[in-house]
From Swiss-Prot:
Residues 62-82, 185-218 are annotated as: Disordered. InterPro entries: HCR (IPR009800). This is Coiled-coil alpha-helical rod protein 1. Residues 62-74, 208-218 have a biased composition (Basic and acidic residues). The keyword Cytoplasm applies. One of its GO terms (biological process) is cell differentiation. May be a regulator of keratinocyte proliferation or differentiation. PANTHER family: COILED-COIL ALPHA-HELICAL ROD PROTEIN 1 (PTHR46822:SF1). GO terms for cellular component: centriole; cytoplasm; nucleus.
C-alpha cells in the first residue's frame, strides 16, 4: 500500500469506487422511433421482419450499457490490487475518464434529446392509439349498426317482397276474376243476342209464311172474283134476254113504254143501289111507287081493252039478220082475241109478280150483300188494324234491335273501359315493379356499403392487434409520455368524432323510411284502385244483369205479341174460311142478280183489289225493310261474333304474357334471393374466419348468456307475431354492441393503469437522477 500523497490535485479513491446503477430508463435507440405505430395491412409483415432484424441490435445495445455500468467496479478493484501502478497510470486514467465523462455527457444529452423526441412521438402515438381506439369503437359500433340495419333491411326486404308478391297475386286473382266474369257476361249477352236474333229470324220466317199464305188467299180471292165476273156476265145476258122479251111483249100488246124513262128508272135504281145502307129505304119506297104505277098501268090496260071490246062490238053489229055467219066469225074472233089478251094479261101479271118477287129477292140479296160488304169492310178494317199492329210490332222489334245495338255498343264501351282499367292496373303494376326494383337496387347499394365496411373490419382489426402488440413491446418506454399525453388530453378538447358514417347511416335510415312510406302509399293506391275496379265491375255486372232482365222481359213481350198475332191470324183464317163458304153460297145466288148489282160488285171488287194491292205492296215493302233490318242485324251479329273472337284471342294472349312475366319475375326473385343468401353466407364466413365471432363469444359469453336466457324466457312466455321480426333483430343487435363497448372500455382501463404506473416509475427515476447529479456536482467542483 502506498501512503497517500498530500497533493490536493489528486482524485479521491471514492471517485473510482463502483457507483450504483442509475435508475434512468434505458433510452431506446433512434431507430426505434422510426418504426411507425400504425401501419397499413400491406406493410405489417415488412415491419415485423424489421423488428426481428433490429432485435439483435437492441440486445447488443443493452450489453454495451451493462458493460459500461460494470467497468468502473473493475477499475476500482484494479486500483486496490495494483496500487503501485496507479500513480503511473493516473494521468492516462484521468484522461480516459474525462473522455468517458464527456462521452457520457454527450450520450446523456443525446439520450435526453431522443427521450424528448420519444415523448413527442409517444404522445402522438398515444393520441393515435386513442384515435384508433375511438375509430375501432366507432367502427365496431358502425359495424353492429350496419349489421342491425342489414338485418332490418333484410327483414324489410323480405316483408316488402312478400307484401308485393301477395299484392301481385291478389291483383292477378282479381284481374282473372274480372276477366272471367266479363267474359261470362259477354258470352251470356252474346247467347241472348243470338237467341233473340234466332227468334227474330223465326218471326220473320213466320211472317214470310203468313205473307205467302195471304198472297195465296189473295190469288184465290182474285180467281173467285173472276168467276163472279163470269157469273155476273151470264146473269147480265139473262137479264138482257128477259128485257128484250118484255119489250117484245109490250110491243105486241101495243103499248110502248119509252126506253128513256125505263133507263132513267134503272139508272136511278142503280145509283140508289150503289149508295150506302142509309138509302135502302128510299129504294124500297121507289120500288113501291113503281109497283103502284104498274098497277095503274094494268088497270088502264084493262080499261082500254074493255073500251076496245065495246068499240069492236059496236063496229061488228049486224045491219040485218041475214048475216049470222059474219057475226059468228066476229064473235069467235073476239073470243079468241079475248082469250089471247087474257092469256097475255095472265102472263104479264105472272111476269109482274115474278118481277116483284125477284125485285124483293134482289133487294134482300142486296141488303144481305150490303151487310156482308159492311162485315167484310169491318173485317178488312180489322185486318188492316192487325196489319198496322204487325207493322207496329215490327217497328217495336226494330226499336228493340236498335236498343240491342245500343246495349251492344254500351257493352263494347264497358269492355273498352275495362281494357283501360286493365291497362291502368298494368301500369300501376309496372310502377310497383319499378318501385320494388328501385328498392332492390337501394338494398344492393346498402349491401355493397355493408360489404365494404365488413371488408374494412379485418384491416382495422389487424391494425388494432398490431397496435396492441406494439404497446406491449414499448410498455416500459411510454410512462412519462402517456402521463403528458393524459395531461394534454385533459387540457385539450377532444377531436370531433367521425360523423361521416353516422351521417351516412342516418341518410340510409331516412331513405329506408322514405321507401317504406312510398311502398305503403303505393300499396294503399293499389288497394284503392283494386277496390275501385271491383266496384266498377260490380256496377257493370248489375247493369248487365238489369239489361239482361229487360231483354228477357222484351223477349217475353214479343213472344206474347207473336202468340196474339197467331191467334188473330187463326181468327182471320176462320173468317176467311167463312167468307169462302159465304162466297160459295153467293155463287148460287148471284145467278139471278142483275147488271146493276154486278157492276156495283165489280166496283166494290175493284176497290177491294186496289186496297188489297196497296196493303200487299205495303206489306211487301215492310217485309223488304224487315229483311234489310234482319240482314243488318245478321251482319252486326257476325261482326260482334268476330269481335268477340278477337277479344277472346287478345285476352288469351294477355293471359299468356302475364303468365310469362310472372314466371320471369319469380325466377329473377329466386336468383336474387340465392345471391343474397350467398352474400350473407360469405359475410358470416369472413366474420368467422377473422375470429370476431369467437372472440365476441369468449369475451361476452358470461355477460350475455343470462340476458339471452331471460329474453328467451320472455319470448317463450309471450310469443310475438311475425311482424315484430325486424324489432327483435334490432334488439338482439343491441347486446352485441354493448359487449364490444365493454371490451373496448376494459382495454382502455388497462392502458390507463399501465400508463399511470410507468409515469410513476419515470417520476421516481427522474428524482433519483436529480439527486445523483446534485451530489456529483460538488465533488467535481472539489
Amino acid at each position: 500500500m502506498f501512503p497517500p500523497s498530500g497533493s490536493t490535485g489528486l482524485i479521491p479513491p471514492s471517485h473510482f469506487q463502483a457507483r450504483p446503477l442509475s435508475t434512468l430508463p434505458r433510452m431506446a435507440p433512434t431507430w426505434l422511433s422510426d418504426i411507425p405505430l400504425v401501419q397499413p395491412p400491406g406493410h405489417q409483415d415488412v415491419s415485423e421482419r424489421q423488428l426481428d432484424t433490429q432485435r439483435p441490435q437492441v440486445t447488443m445495445w443493452e450489453r454495451d450499457v451493462s458493460s459500461d455500468r460494470q467497468e468502473p467496479g473493475r477499475r476500482g478493484r484494479s486500483w486496490g490490487l495494483e496500487g503501485s501502478q496507479a500513480l503511473s497510470q493516473q494521468a492516462e486514467v484521468i484522461a480516459r475518464q474525462l473522455q468517458e465523462l464527456r462521452r457520457l455527457e454527450e450520450e446523456v444529452r443525446l439520450l435526453r434529446e431522443t427521450s424528448l423526441q420519444q415523448k413527442m412521438r409517444l404522445e402522438a402515438q398515444a393520441m393515435e392509439l386513442e384515435a384508433l381506439a375511438r375509430a375501432e369503437k366507432a367502427g365496431r359500433a358502425e359495424a353492429e349498426g350496419l349489421r342491425a340495419a342489414l338485418a332490418g333491411a333484410e327483414v324489410v326486404r323480405k316483408n316488402l317482397e312478400e307484401g308485393s308478391q301477395r299484392e301481385l297475386e291478389e291483383v292477378q286473382r282479381l284481374h282473372q276474376e274480372q276477366l272471367s266474369s266479363l267474359t261470362q257476361a259477354h258470352k251470356e249477352a252474346l247467347s241472348s243476342l243470338t237467341s233473340k236474333a234466332e227468334g227474330l229470324e223465326k218471326s220473320l220466317s213466320s211472317l214470310e209464311t203468313r205473307r205467302a199464305g195471304e198472297a195465296k188467299e189473295l190469288a184465290e180471292a182474285q180467281r173467285e172474283a173472276e168467276l163472279l165476273r163470269k157469273q155476273l156476265s151470264k146473269t147480265q145476258e139473262d137479264l138482257e134476254a128477259q128485257v128484250t122479251l118484255v119489250e117484245n111483249l109490250r110491243k105486241y100488246v101495243g103499248e110502248q113504254v119509252p126506253s128513256e124513262v125505263h133507263s132513267q128508272t134503272w139508272e136511278l135504281e142503280r145509283q140508289k143501289l150503289l149508295e150506302t145502307m142509309q138509302h135502302l129505304q128510299e129504294d124500297r119506297d121507289s120500288l113501291q111507287a113503281t109497283a103502284e104505277l104498274l098497277q095503274v098501268r094494268v088497270q088502264s090496260l084493262t080499261h082500254i081493252l074493255a073500251l076496245q071490246e065495246e068499240e069492236l062490238t059496236r063496229k061488228v053489229q049486224p045491219s040485218d039478220s041475214l048475216e049470222p055467219e059474219f057475226t059468228r066469225k066476229c064473235q069467235s074472233l073476239l073470243n079468241r082475241w079475248r082469250e089471247k089478251v087474257f092469256a097475255l094479261m095472265v102472263q104479264l101479271k105472272a111476269q109482274e109478280l115474278e118481277h116483284s118477287d125477284s125485285v124483293k129477292q134482289l133487294k134482300g140479296q142486296v141488303a144481305s150483300l150490303q151487310e156482308k160488304v159492311t162485315s167484310q169492310s169491318q173485317e178488312q178494317a180489322i185486318l188492316q188494324q192487325s196489319l198496322q199492329d204487325k207493322a207496329a210490332e215490327v217497328e217495336v222489334e226494330r226499336m228493340g234491335a236498335k236498343g240491342l245495338q245500343l246495349e251492344l255498343s254500351r257493352a263494347q264501351e264497358a269492355r273498352c273501359r275495362w281494357q283501360q282499367q286493365t291497362a291502368s292496373a298494368e301500369e300501376q303494376l309496372r310502377l310497383v315493379v319499378n318501385a320494388v326494383s328501385s328498392s332492390q337496387i337501394w338494398l344492393e347499394t346498402t349491401m355493397a356499403k355493408v360489404e365494404g365496411a365488413a371488408a374494412q373490419l379485418p384491416s382495422l382489426n389487424n391494425r388494432l392487434s398490431y397496435a396492441v402488440r406494439k404497446v406491449h413491446t414499448i410498455r416500459g418506454l411510454i410512462a412519462q409520455k402517456l402521463a403528458l399525453a393524459q395531461l394534454r388530453q385533459e387540457s385539450c378538447p377532444l377531436p370531433p368524432p367521425v360523423t361521416d358514417v353516422s351521417l351516412e347511416l342516418q341518410q340510409l335510415r331516412e331513405e329506408r323510411n322514405r321507401l317504406d312510406a312510398e311502398l305503403q302509399l303505393s300499396a294503399r293506391l293499389i288497394q284503392q284502385e283494386v277496390g275501385r275496379a271491383r266496384e266498377q265491375g260490380e256496377a257493370e255486372r248489375q247493369q248487365l244483369s238489369k239489361v239482361a232482365q229487360q231483354l228477357e222481359q222484351e223477349l217475353q213481350q214479343t213472344q206474347e205479341s207473336l202468340a196474339s198475332l197467331g191467334l188473330q191470324l187463326e181468327v182471320a183464317r176462320q173468317g176467311q174460311q167463312e167468307s169462302t163458304e159465304e162466297a160459295a153460297s153467293l155463287r148460287q145466288e148471284l145467278t139471278q142478280q142483275q147488271e146493276l148489282y154486278g157492276q156495283a160488285l165489280q166496283e166494290k171488287v175493284a176497290e177491294v183489289e186496289t186496297r188489297l194491292r196497296e196493303q200487299l205492296s205495303d206489306t211487301e215493302r215492310r217485309l223488304n225493310e224487315a229483311r234489310r233490318e234482319h240482314a243488318k242485324a245478321v251482319v252486326s251479329l257476325r261482326q260482334i261474333q268476330r269481335r268477340a273472337a278477337q277479344e277472346k284471342e287478345r285476352s288469351q294472349e294477355l293471359r299468356r304474357l302475364q303468365e310469362e312475366a310472372r314466371k320471369e319475375e319469380g325466377q329473377r326473385l329466386a336468383r336474387r334471393l340465392q345471391e343474397l343468401e350467398r352474400d350473407k353466407n360469405l359475410m358470416l364466413a369472413t366474420l368467422q374466419q377473422e375470429g370476431l365471432l369467437s372472440r365476441y363469444k369468449q369475451q361476452r359469453l358470461l355477460t350475455v348468456l343470462p340476458s339471452l336466457l331471460d329474453k328467451k324466457k320472455s319470448v317463450v312466455s309471450s310469443p310475438r307475431p311475425p311482424e315484430c321480426s325486424a324489432s327483435a333483430s334490432v334488439a338482439a343487435a343491441v347486446p352485441t354492441r354493448e359487449s364490444i363497448k365493454g371490451s373496448l372500455s376494459v382495454l382502455l382501463d388497462d392502458l390507463q393503469g399501465l400508463s399511470e404506473a410507468i409515469s410513476k416509475e419515470e417520476a421516481v427515476c427522474q428524482g433519483d437522477n436529480l439527486d445523483r447529479c446534485s451530489s456529483s456536482n460538488p465533488q467535481m467542483s472539489s
